[in-house]
Amino acid sequence: MLTIYDIAKKAGVSASTVSKVLNGRPGVGKKTIEKVKQITEELGYYPNSIARGLATKKSKTVGVFFEDHLNSGFRHPFLQDILASFKDVIGAHGYDLIFFTNNHPDNHVETFEARARHRNVDGLFLMGIPRTDKNLDAIIASNIPCISIDLDLCGPRANYICSDNIGGAASAVEYFISKGHKKIACITDFFATKPGEDRLVGYLRAMEKHGLSLKKEWIARSDFSDQGGLLSTRKLLDSDPSLTAIFCAGDMMALGAMRAIKEKGLAVGKDISIIGFDNISLLSYVTPSLTTVSQKKEAMGEMAAKELIKLMEDPYYRADPITIETELIIRDTVCNLVENS
């Protein structure tokens, strides 16, 4: 069996030098690096990642936990964009990804921490995990470097990244109000997620700021699916036909809301105005084009990777939560009641 000692003998260097080259560690000259790599390729030597991990106490892998309430898996457009940019940055630093399934038979008996340690990952990336998950305290206490998206996970080796969900939601409601809307409903989520709760807060703050009356039946809770938006909008319009606008905490909700409005024989953007949240790529196929709050998904993925690398590679790094600004994208689903009055 070919070993690094065989490489070292042929290259005329020590085994430790070969190890440094193969693991990308400093302290080796450029010519020696090129020579070792050339001989490695000639002999067809492939380092054993498990053995290397035992020697360095690093597996160069990152575990990804994703809890999917809607069973859409990695097909969800918001998730796709974040994961793509996260993978690019983490991969460029020599790390591979391990995806932990959320329907594994051991899920009910093994914690996130236990599964992460079993796979010997260097860090964790969490998405879609609700604040109420009983495993989160153990993850924070474990000191396994961890970064999360839209989950306020804080600890010595844990940090999180989120969009300005409160500000983004408030900007959507402010835009409705600037167009003369006063009877504005909100569809948020019932999963106790940070984005859902924060977007509801933004809606409430904007309504209160402008002294608008608010009926409890104007707030509907749903999941983040188009079906959830459809059912919620049906209830909203049945309970109060005088509503003129609906803010949806997610674009998929908004697409369902648009369908419900059309079912009522009403026109989206004329009879009832809609604003979503996310700016998913699917919107380019929707008519009328949806006004929405855009999240910088690629930037979130890149920042998550960079923060996790710091947490994994610098034991003294102490991170602060990162909030990324949003942008209201104005399209065709909000009518101007001021002009029509």
What are the residue ranges of the model-derived segments?
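Alpha-helical recognition/docking segments in bacterial nutrient-uptake
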Residues: L2, K57, T61-E174, S178, ...
